A protein has these predicted regions:
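Local sequence-structure signature of Cys/Sec-based thiol-disulfide redox active-site neighborhoods
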Residues: 2-39
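Glycine-rich, charge-decorated loop segments at or immediately adjacent to ligand/cofactor-binding or catalytic sites
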Residues: 60-65, 109-113
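Charged phosphate-binding loop/patch that engages nucleotide di/tri-phosphates or the phosphate backbone
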Residues: 110-130
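N-terminal/domain-start segments enriched in small and hydrophobic, helix-friendly residues
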Residues: 6-9, 13, 92, 99-101, ...
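Active-site/pore-lining binding-face segments in mid-to-C-terminal subdomains
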Residues: 61-70, 74-77
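Short alpha-helical
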Residues: 27, 55-58, 87
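Non-catalytic, surface beta->alpha helical segment in thiol-disulfide oxidoreductase systems
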Residues: 72-115
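Thiol-based oxidoreductase modules, predominantly thioredoxin-like and allied folds used
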Residues: 21, 41-59, 65-67
């Protein structure tokens, strides 16, 4: 396993992890690694790791990976993405940008949920069954 963690300032939450789950025998994974490392260098605010699910089985645990490479993006709040990804630097970069844009602040989520709760008949598609 290779890990490239940036130093975290004590005053902020830990950086999200971007983990490529791969296998040494996978030619696509071997070709993808330099591109993955290039994206890692371009995003120093994130932590990147390369995990060979066979060589690093003690770390990979029971992940059932069927398609390589598989990407896992997770932070302190949970899994943001897990699935196979086309092995292109541009695809990974777009995925990371989309995940960052799609992660609203807790205040924004709380405000939306409060508005929905205040007028459920206006928004709810089907009321919950009694």
């Amino acid at each position: 396993m290779t890990v490239a963690p940036p130093p975290d300032a004590p005053s902020r939450a830990p950086s999200p992890w971007v983990v490529c789950l791969c296998a040494q025998w996978c030619g696509t994974c071997r070709d993808y690694r330099p591109l993955f490392e290039e994206v890692a260098r371009a995003h120093p605010h994130l932590r990147f790791a390369w995990v060979d699910i066979e060589d690093d089985a003690d770390v990979a645990g029971d992940f059932d990976i069927e398609t390589f490479p598989t990407l896992l993006v997770a932070d302190a709040e949970g899994t943001r993405f897990m699935g196979p990804l086309l092995p292109h630097a541009a695809t990974l970069t777009r995925t990371l940008a989309a995940l960052r844009a799609a992660h609203p602040s807790e205040a924004d989520v709380a405000a939306l949920l409060a508005a929905l709760a205040a007028a459920p008949a206006r928004f709810e598609l089907a009321p919950p069954a009694a």
